[in-house]
Regions:
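An acidic/histidine-cluster motif and surrounding catalytic segment
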Residues: 99
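Terminal catalytic/cofactor-binding subdomain
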Residues: 1-95
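Loop-rich catalytic cores of soluble enzymes, especially ATP-dependent carboxylate-amine ligases
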Residues: 74, 104-192
Length: 192
């Protein structure tokens, strides 16, 4: 892939926000605009890869990575994760898509978090694309979930009725030393 790395921006068109290695952030007003933009990016990627004899494959885990060989992404946040969770941070070589939804109020964000939480099993079924772990078929359609579920603050958001309850719960997690920031919450649906 080194030859691809050298020429990847030559044909890619206008730049997008790239917050880190392997991450792409796109902000659009409507779902239709986001779908059109992602479709165009997918087509551009496919064309560029074909010119360079590279295949494209999607998934939620790397199909044959070996976690002891993973490097921790440079930066305080990931170094802290590694110090706190050790090998879990290296096993956390997963990727996926997340969506930010704008809300008119903090209480609406909590309501939406709770309302979307009941659909998580359907989201998982629709996105099942990670059957391999360390090069072996896991017999799970979404082994990615197992990597995330190892973290203490993963899974469903606890039942919270409003933003005040969320801030009290989060303050409790901080006081216990479990969470330093909101990004420490690996909930399936998370308010921000």
């Amino acid at each position: 892939l080194s030859r691809f790395r050298e020429s990847r921006y030559t044909h890619a068109g206008p730049p997008h926000h790239l917050p880190g290695r392997g991450a792409l952030h796109i902000s659009r007003e409507t779902v239709e605009e986001a779908c059109a933009d992602l479709g165009g990016l997918r087509d551009t990627l496919r064309q560029h890869c074909e010119r360079n004899n590279i295949g494209v494959c999607g998934g939620g885990t790397h199909p044959f990575h070996h976690w002891p060989e993973r490097r921790i992404c440079p930066g305080d946040r990931f170094n802290d994760l590694y110090q706190r969770y050790g090998y879990l941070a290296k096993q956390f070589t997963v990727f996926g898509q997340h969506v930010h939804v704008g809300c008119t109020s903090a209480d609406e964000a909590i309501w939406l978090t709770q309302a979307l939480g009941v659909y998580v099993p359907a989201f998982i079924a629709l996105s099942a694309s990670s059957p391999f772990v360390d090069g072996v078929d896991s017999f799970y359609q979404s082994a990615r979930l197992n990597a995330v579920s190892a973290f203490p603050l993963s899974g469903q958001c606890p039942p919270l009725g409003n933003w005040q309850e969320f801030t009290e719960h989060f303050a409790f997690l901080q006081a216990c030393g479990i969470a330093q920031g909101i990004k420490d919450l690996y909930w399936d649906v998370r308010p921000k």
